[in-house]
Design a protein with these regions (language model features):
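Conserved, structured core segments of small domains
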Residues: 1-116
Length: 116
């Protein structure tokens, strides 16, 4: 089995739209979204290598020093699957973007380190 890093992507526009929802509607969506996310985790437990977590603010370290930056990454999970396609299919209809205001999930293979 190969390992894949899945990054949850969100946009400021989607979050702003979410925040404009009526509080009662938003709370109902949060409750159903949390349940759906837990159900997704249970259904895919055999594929999940690392449950991951939400991500906080970003710092960039470079030859120019350390700076604050913004990106669209909101969380991650590591899964295992036979192929890149199979890993991506795990996230079809994921609550991150079907219930919550997430934009998408980007999935990339974790490649082995080169060397002896």
């Amino acid at each position: 089995m190969k390992k894949f890093l899945a990054i949850y992507i969100g946009t400021e526009a989607a979050l702003a739209k979410w925040k404009k929802l009526d509080e009662q509607k938003r709370k109902a969506l949060e409750a159903s979204g949390i349940k759906a996310w837990m159900d997704w985790g249970t259904a895919n437990a055999a594929a999940i290598v690392d449950q991951g977590s939400p991500l906080g603010k970003t710092k960039r370290a470079s030859a120019r020093g350390v700076s604050d930056i913004k990106n669209a990454m909101t969380g991650y999970v590591i899964v295992q699957a036979e192929s890149h396609e199979a890993a991506a299919r795990l996230f079809e209809s994921h609550p991150h973007f079907t219930i919550f205001p997430g934009d998408s999930v980007e999935i990339m293979e974790c490649l082995p380190l080169p060397g002896p």
